[in-house]
Structure formats: C-alpha cells, structure tokens
Amino acid sequence: MNAKQAKEGKTMQRVLLHVMAGLALGACLAGCSSVETADAEARQLPPMPALAARPVQAEAWFMGPQHTRLRVRKLEGVRRADGGLAFTVAKEEITPDVVDVEIHADVAQARKGDAGYALAQRGLVFDFARDELTWIQHRGWLYMPYYAMKTPQHVFLAVMEGMRFEHDLLLLARKGRYEMFPRWRISEIGAAPYEDMTVVFYQLPPEADYNAMAKAYRSYRFAQDPSIRTLKERIRTRPQLAQLARSVAIRQSHAGKPWKLPDSNRDFTAADEPPVQTYVTYDQTLERLKKLKAAGVDDVALCVAGWQNGGYDGRCPTSFPVEEGPGGEAGLRRLCEGGRALGYLVDGHSNYTDCFTCSPDWRGGEIACKKPDGSLYTNGAWSGGKAHNLCLKHAWATFLPGDLERIAQLGFRGCHYIDVFTAVQPYRCSDPRHPATTKEQAAVQLAVAKRCHALFGGFSSECCMDHLLGQVDYINYVCAPMRGKRQAEAKGRKSAVDRFVPFFELAFHDVVLSNPDKITQEVLSPEDNLTLVEYGGRPIFYSLNERNMPGIVKAWEQFKTLRPLQLEEMTEHRILSDGFVRVTYANGARLYVNHTSRPCADGAVEVAAKSFRLLGM
C-alpha cells in the first residue's frame, strides 16, 4: 500500500466512524434503547407498591418577568394504568410572555410541626420544623426528577416528565407553611418549548415511608425505560461487570498542570499555559499494584487518569498524542498489560464534558456550546483554565467516535470513565452550526455510553443523572450533600437538609455500583465508614501510594465480607432507634449498623457500639 492509499484508507475510516455515530444518534433520538432491550419484554419488572388513590387538586401557574403570575389554570388529572395520577400542561399553552411554568398540588403542602417530612434527590430529608425555608435544586444537578412528602394527610411520590432538564425543584416555607413544586424555566431553554410538562402523583398508604417512595420510583423507572436492567442481568452479556462489583476502585492520576485559583481562572493559549508535570510514572503505578497484590488485595479496578495530552484536565477535549512524561504510550500499555496480569481491571479516565482554549481542537471556539447571544458557557476553572461547555453533539459528529476507538486501542478494558458526564445536566447549545437542546445532547450521551460498552466493556462516571441509568455501570459517588451539610455546619451555618436516607440505594443499589458521598471516599474515619456500610457503598481511593496502602488493604478486608451484597437489591432500610438501623437485602441478608456509642439490640441480635453486624449470608 502506498502513502496515498494509506491516507485514503484513514480518511475512509474516519468517514465510516462519523456515519456510524450519526446512525447511532439517530437511533437514540428515535427512541431506540439499544440491543440490550431486545429481551425487554422478558424482564421481570419491579412491582409498584400498594397505592391509596385519593383526590388531588393541581394547578398550572404561568409566570411572567419578576415572577409575576400571568394566569392560573386548574388541571384535570388522568389516571394511568400503573395507578399514577398525571397532570399535564401542553407545550402549546406556553405563550411568548411566559417565563416559567409551575405545577402546584394541594397534597404537596404541610405546616410547621406536622409529623412527616419532604424528600428529594438521593434521599435528602426536610423535617417540617421551620418558619422560613428556601431550598431550590437547580435543574443542572437534579439527578432524579421526583419529589415526595409524608404528612398527616398525604403520603406520595411525584415524578416530573417532559423537558427533563429544564425544571428546578423548590421547597419553600413561608410563615410555617410548606409547599413543594417543580418550576420549568421556559425562558432559559434556548429554544422553543419542545415537550409537554407533566407531574405524576403516586399516592401511598398513610403508614408508608421513604422505603415505599423509593420502590415506587424504582417501579416507575424500570417500566418507563426498557434499557434499565439489574447488574445481574447485565452480567449475562458483559461478564466483566461481575469482577467490577468484586473490586475496590482506585483512581491514579499521572500527570497534570498546576491548578490554583484565581490564577487558573483564565483562558490559556499554547504560548502561556503552565507546563505539564509528571506526578507518577506508569511503571511506578504498576510496581505499587504488585505490592497491593502481595498484600492480599485480590480485586482492584484501576482508573488511569492524567494520561491524555496535557495531563489531567489539561487540554480537554484533546486526548492525543498521549502525554509523554509518565511514560508515553509504551508505558501506558505496560501498565494495562501488567495490571491485567495481576488479575486487575485497568481502564482509563476521559473528559469529554469540558473544553479549554489551550486545546489544539479549540479552533476559535467551534467545539464549545454557545448561549443564544453567541457567548460561551463556562462551568468553572481547572488546570486547563476556564472550563467551557463542550458541545457533545458537535464532538460526536466530528472527532469523538474516533477518539474512543483510539483510547480502546491503548489497552483499556473494564468500565471507561468519562468525567462529569452524569453529574450535570446535558449542556444545551445555541451555536447555529450545531444547535442542540438538552434532550438532544442527552441522546448523544446515550450513544457515547453504548459505544463505551462495546469498546471497553462498561461505562462509568460520577453522580447519576438517571436518564443514563440503563447505561451507567458504576458511579464514583451518588452526589455530595452529606459533605455539603458537614461543611455548612462547620462554618456555623444551618443546612437546609435535616438528615439523609438511602433513597437512591433503595431504588437502584442492584442497578449501579456506587459510593454514597464524598465523605465516604478514601481512607475513612470510623463514623464515615459506618455510613459507607449502611448505604451499601463500594470503597474508592483517588491515589495509590505507600501512605494510603494500609488503608486500602484494611478497606479490602472489610469489603470482602460485604461485596456479595453489591449485586443485591436493598429491600428495606429501617431506623430501629436513633443511630441504629437495619438494612435488608433481597438475598435475605440483614445488615445492622450501630452509629451510637452504646450497644444496641434488635430482639436477640446485639450490635456493639460503633460497629456493624451482617447476618443471613
């Protein structure tokens, strides 16, 4: 083959990749859920908990500028086959003067002092104990589109449908009167409203609590999305996920540029960007893995970070050529091969969420999402400078499919990690060259996740925007409100959140491998370790070195006892007394966790202070 033929061959390969990417995106936008749904009808869907249908009154509030109420319309509920009561605002009702649309319901109200609570997100509990409260969950971080309440009059779960990434969730208390409702931010869509807006109420019996709320959401999501399957079902076609579930997670970064605020909060160029520094070489990491294996840690899932061009968060979205400092491609391949020889999973970390001006692919900002006025969206500042939002639709149509192919060829296998992918809402783009709504960008995310399944064997990220629930196999942490509450209270501020329950785990513990929160990562304090155990989490460490290796070995010894639970549904979380809980799993296991400084008992079962006890295994 001569040089001309070789060049033509590479060109044709790129064309084919782009055609395949386009076909995949088209299938996603058309509602195709993947080949995994071929046997969707054979799935055993989780049952909906017992419901208790009662009247619900709901209204749509059409809001104008400065939050003026333009008009109110009473909504008629439509009973669904699964027992839910749906209230809908048609997109055609939205006139040009409407800024926001809110759906208010009489059941979603309470008074200060009422028994019960409001519930949202991963399991944030708000007691009815305040005169004034303003809690707004921005749509950018609304991981599950639901809200729930237990009051003396009503117990319900409500699910928002339509324009999934365009609404906030609010819990307000004014003079002791509480109300919870969604608000669709119509003026900030960046396009015409493209879907109707619906809230579906699932009313539960008076004795029901957050357990039934979570099971109702589980049933709803499984029925709504045929691609959602349990880990046990996924393992049938991707057996390496069984090894992932048995493994302690370790991420090791190898190179990067200095990150220091406010110095990093600028747009760098190739001429003035800071130099890339090598933290650790691939050969050094491999030697540390060997020591870990010799210490008795049999199963590890290593996520190799900082391998790409510019190091960790250095020149995103550019991945190639591989950064030379830690050992280049040759060293990276040695790490992949050597890690697998030890029986470990070795996969990589990518960032196809941010883009930096110092990236060779910047091209005047062509790759970035634009606001309607043409300016850039910015989501923070990292080693590469100001982090602008990457237009995933444009990336998928141009370079991303080829990048993923090349990354796989480096030797990564296991569960490829794409940073932030499921931690924030998909980024809208108003660039006339590649406009995309959040719904369209979500479809691209789905296509990318499926490609990761095919190339690497799995897909992982952080948090869990649950539109990708059927595709994501592992998340580094569910989200970080426990850390947020701790940090606020350390500074003398009262957190809006009163406490936490494992709503996410009750709904999806057997669907996505996870770690509860940022406070339950790395080497843990005894109390945070008990939270990790209570929530059924998988240990994770963000480095591997001589200092933390004893902590990793200790976590491994504990995890060996608990890891059979990773594939099991969490069926019930029961608070037996303050600080003493019993967690039940579908395989019959009972896990008692005692957070108190005294022994506790459940009948004949005694649990020592500050410890846990696993029975039925």
List PLM regions with ranges:
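Conserved, mostly hydrophobic/aromatic
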Residues: 89, 292, 339, 419, ...
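Aromatic-lined carbohydrate-binding/catalytic grooves of carbohydrate-active enzymes
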Residues: 247-401, 413-414, 422-427, 431-433
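Short, low-complexity, charge-dense intrinsically disordered segments
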Residues: 1-14, 18, 23, 27
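Carbohydrate-active enzymes and regulators
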Residues: 91, 305-308, 317-320, 410, ...
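Active-site-proximal substrate-binding groove within the catalytic cores of carbohydrate-active enzymes
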Residues: 162-167, 181-211, 273-275, 359, ...
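Carbohydrate-recognition beta-sandwich/jelly-roll modules
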Residues: 41-301, 307, 342-345
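A mature extracytoplasmic/lumenal domain signature
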Residues: 91-93, 306-308, 420-422, 596
